[in-house]
Amino acid sequence: MAPDRQRTKRLLHLSPKGGSGKSGLSRLLMSAAIRDGLRAIGLDADPQGTFAGWMSKRERYRKKAPEVPYAEVRVAAFADAARALDEIAADLVVVDTPTALENDPVATKALILASDLVLIPCQPLDDDVRSVKTIMLTVQELGRPAYFVLNKVKRTVKEAESSRRELGKVGPVIAASIPDSIQIARAMAHGLGVVETNGTGADDVSSVWAEAKRLLAMA
């Protein structure tokens, strides 16, 4: 049975901080959703096109490994992204966004209101933590559920827990975090997710996805 557009869940990745990991999280969670057998479609609203480029790499990889499931990532201008969502029927749409959200507050608001869950990735660094607090408050003011996701976490660095506590003063934080793993980067370089290669970080990504899926009422 084809997915019902009215039942499509929309997962938005949002952050005003460059390098926070929006595109990476989009790729990781979309591949986890596909592995779960969901009809997941990506929407790349970032002019850098990293998410869409990942799909192209995946298609090249599938030529030698056709057993790898197909992944579809559509492209839309940020100003048109909320309208583009209305044209997608799937189990899940994963949305990647640009950094300069302040350049188009109307589009930012429209995307937030159109989403079922907003994830705000953040590296465990003081500058990053400070920069993402405002967007969490914005999402909360608009009445949409939002969670921080700690990203590129080094296991032996104590700053991760202090960052978690600081973020928790503003909004909820996903219990699991994305580690700083070269195997995550290597998987994405081939258009894959680490859950598909079972590399270091696969269990962490699976845990983040499991929590997101629960919050989306898809579990």
Please place each PLM-identified region on the residue numbering.
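NTP-binding/hydrolysis catalytic cores, primarily Walker-type P-loop NTPases
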Residues: 193-219
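P-loop/Walker-type NTP enzyme "switch/lid" segment
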Residues: 2-20, 27-105, 109-110, 188-189
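Short, well-ordered alpha-helix to beta-strand connector turns
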Residues: 90, 115-116, 171
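Beta-strand-loop-alpha "switch" segments that mediate conformational coupling across diverse proteins
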Residues: 154-156, 164-195
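Inter-motif core of Ras-like GTPase G domains
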Residues: 104-125
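Conserved C-terminal guanine-recognition region of P-loop GTPase G domains, centered on the G4
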Residues: 129-151
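Structural beta-sheet core signal
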Residues: 42, 95, 120, 148-150
